[in-house]
Structure formats: C-alpha cells, structure tokens
Amino acid sequence: MLIINDEEARALSGEYSIAKAARKILKMGPRFLVIKKGEHGALLFSGNEIFFAPALPMEDVFDPTGAGDVFAGGFMGYLAKTKNLSFTNMKRAIIYGSAMASFCVEKFGPQRLLEIQQRQIQKRVGEFVDLVKFRIK
C-alpha cells in the first residue's frame, strides 16, 4: 500500500500522466496505490482496476492544511477497523478518508476533528454516496 499525492506520483515515476505514473509505480511493488488529488479527490489503483472518488464540494473551506494527512488517517483507520484488504473495501476506505478530510477543512487547525461524532461521519459518507450515485454495502 502506498499513498502519495499526484506531484509525488509524477516525481517518483517520471511520468506526467497519472495513469502511466500509477502503472509504473505499481510495477515497483505496491499491491495498492492511492494517489491524492487534493480538492479534486483521490484515485485507487490495483492491477488493472481503477477507482476514482471526487472530493466533496465544500462551500466553506477555512484551512486545507493537513487534509491529505487526515485523508490517509481516515483511509488507514477504516482498513484497520474492517481488517479487509480487498479492492472493494479499499474503495470504501477512500470514501471514509475523503469524508474525514472534508471535516478537516471546516476550521483552522485540528479543532473540527476533535468535535465530530460517529453519526456525523456516517452522514458525511452518505453525502459522498449521494454525490457519486453508488452504494457502499
């Protein structure tokens, strides 16, 4: 598992195209590759499979600092909780990571993350499901 941003993927692979970069990086060894694209979402690659999850459009963004790290923490936290490393579950983890990152940008610093409750996380995940019109089983 490797989680990097799009600029890191380009630098590591020497490719400008994210698809070509991902193919090269996967040949280096990771089974799964997540490429974060900031406010534009994230991509998951594994073998010949690709999944894209957009970021939730946020009207009030106060501080994007740390959102990528919060995404990675939410992603890995979901995987640790579910103990399932299938591609399907990785897609769910992308959505949970994106949901957590969306909370991060709502206030300056980590304050918002200290306030959220599980029901709010589930509601935000539901907003992602509605946004992309797919179901998480």
Segments (PLM) and residue ranges:
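A generic structural signal for short hydrophobic patches within well-formed alpha-helices
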Residues: A9-R10
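Conserved phosphate-binding/catalytic region of the ribokinase-like
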Residues: G14-K137
